[in-house]
Amino acid sequence: MSRILVLYHSLWGHVEQMAEAEAEGARSVSGIQVDVRRVPETMPAETLAAVHAKTHQAAPEAHPDDLANYDGIIFGTPTRFGNMTGQMRNFLDRTGNLWQEGRLVGKVGSVFVSTATQHGGQETTLTSFHTFLFHQGMLVVGVPYSCTELMNMDEISGGTPYGASTMSKGDGSRQPSANELTIARFQGRHVAEITRKLFG
């Protein structure tokens, strides 16, 4: 049985919702075990309170060494100035031993993101995150246009061929749309199907 990890960082819960949709899509593929984990929060408690962060999230925290236990990993992060969050960056920077030992080489990797605005850096965050996957020797998977929701022009929506995405609005009031969650489920299923083909 192939194993997939959905690993995310979420401040207001938007990426958390997308992570659950990714996991739902992956679980729809038979012969796949899916775990959802989050990276440790590094922001001080008083700062989290000041920005009204969602501090209670069901997913347990992950350790960098956990990544080697999976055949596919789907990463999710909010965007900070066109890049992943510092919390996710801190977590990934602790995977040097995995890189030295080649323990992620040949595994499947994919990414989804959340931004505050429609043009808030979704694609730059996705593609810059891919650099980490390439350095680890992972096989990068996006969202093909067979996911017809990518072509939806009836509403403002996230979703790119590089990975699923959503928008939170500056105050966090906008929640992931049905279209965005459908794309996330598609991505999760797509990653799971490829992982199963590679690892059984």
Swiss-Prot record:
GO terms for molecular function: flavin adenine dinucleotide binding; FMN binding; NAD binding; NADH:ubiquinone reductase (non-electrogenic) activity; NADP binding; NADPH dehydrogenase (quinone) activity. FMN binds at residues 10-15, 79-81, 114-120, 135. Its cofactor is FMN. It catalyses: a quinone + NADH + H(+) = a quinol + NAD(+); a quinone + NADPH + H(+) = a quinol + NADP(+). Gene3D superfamilies: 3.40.50.360. It comes from the Bacteria. Substrate binds at W99. NAD(+) binds at W12. Belongs to the WrbA family. Residues 4-191 form the Flavodoxin-like domain. Binds 1 FMN per monomer. Coiled coil: none annotated. GO terms for cellular component: membrane. Its EC number is 1.6.5.2. PROSITE patterns: FLAVODOXIN_LIKE. Keywords: Flavoprotein, FMN, NAD, NADP, Nucleotide-binding, Oxidoreductase. This is NAD(P)H dehydrogenase (quinone).
